């Protein structure tokens, strides 16, 4: 016997400043080291979005929080009675380095809740702690847990002093009541209390499976090894998260904006890609249908050359019959709001007004594109995009970043008008 093989039902982001122990924390909970990319292993930092899953269970014989486990046995009491399965969750490990803010923002679009990891042995808040916190608020994350990591390398007094600083920082913000849970990810101390916190504070959202399915793409790849005979080639794979509705094997889908074509005279157009879903998997689990929660890999009939090296990242997948999705080269943003200060730099710089002709970076869902500010009046902003954005609903929030001292910095957000 073991726990049921099911897809994850909730996505939990793991965010915070570089080197504060995000990837180590994910490993402590799931047993998976999410940095797999060769460059990541060499540089010791997360570059792409990492991913891992964990099943959560509770031992009927132990007291809480020790009763919470992520394995099909309890090391605490050694009882023959197996822990009861509660749910499967997935973790999206976002990069903490300042140059990778766009990657963090594209991951935030998939999150149902988040763990903000703070190192107890560094001054609080660090620049990306602050920037990630603001970003989570902008993309409307409601469920947050602050994880005070590395408490094993500071005294009790230092840990308590920082706890008070965190409380002070949260006061008056969207996350004023967020719980703060101290852990040592390296020594796996208090991980059971964190799992209890995840169960209590990051519930699985209510999902409406009758809605038109929408999937945000964060990966795409060719699974064929070099030299595979032509008649054995497998179609391209797209990976991402379904944010509403459900997809099934055999569904005909379209991928937007699609393939880029350069026309004579330098004009660029995008053509939607149409294909059929041939397989669906979550990590090692093959399923017939996929719902929101977890990162799903869709096998398709696409030519593998279309998906190579994450070329479809930022795309949106819908059913081929869906006519309610717009692909926009010109974005009208209303009720846009700028932060008072640029939060991700060491010094807090005042945010200047957006100027006509300024190049901005916009993030919507898992897509990031550059654009030029054209018309600005009151709280409305029009931006001409270098690559079109796919708008799948009304009142979507777009995140606005601009170059500050050679780095893209989060400066505001607005609502897309369609």
UniProtKB/Swiss-Prot annotation:
GO terms for biological process: formation of translation preinitiation complex. GTP binds at residues 19-24, 149-152, 184-186. Keywords: GTP-binding, Hydrolase, Initiation factor, Magnesium, Metal-binding, Nucleotide-binding, Protein biosynthesis, Zinc. Its cofactor is Mg(2+). InterPro entries: eIF2G, eIF2g_C, eIF2g_dom_2, eIF2g_GTP-bd, P-loop_NTPase, Small_GTP-bd, T_Tr_GTP-bd_dom, TIF2_gsu. Mg(2+) 2 binds at residues 19, 44. Residues 16-23 are annotated as: G1. CDD domains: eIF2_gamma (cd01888), eIF2_gamma_II (cd03688), eIF2_gamma_III (cd15490). Residues 93-96 are annotated as: G3. It catalyses: GTP + H2O = GDP + phosphate + H(+). Residues 7-206 form the tr-type G domain. Residues 184-186 are annotated as: G5. One of its GO terms (cellular component) is cytosol. It holds the Pfam family GTP_EFTU. Its EC number is 3.6.5.3. It is an enzyme of class 3 (hydrolase). Mg(2+) 1 binds at residues 23, 46. GO terms for molecular function: GTP binding; GTPase activity; metal ion binding; translation elongation factor activity; translation initiation factor activity; tRNA binding. Residues 149-152 are annotated as: G4. Heterotrimer composed of an alpha, a beta and a gamma chain. Belongs to the TRAFAC class translation factor GTPase superfamily. Classic translation factor GTPase family. EIF2G subfamily. eIF-2 functions in the early steps of protein synthesis by forming a ternary complex with GTP and initiator tRNA. PANTHER family: EUKARYOTIC TRANSLATION INITIATION FACTOR 2 SUBUNIT 3 FAMILY MEMBER (PTHR42854), EUKARYOTIC TRANSLATION INITIATION FACTOR 2 SUBUNIT 3-RELATED (PTHR42854:SF3). This is Translation initiation factor 2 subunit gamma.
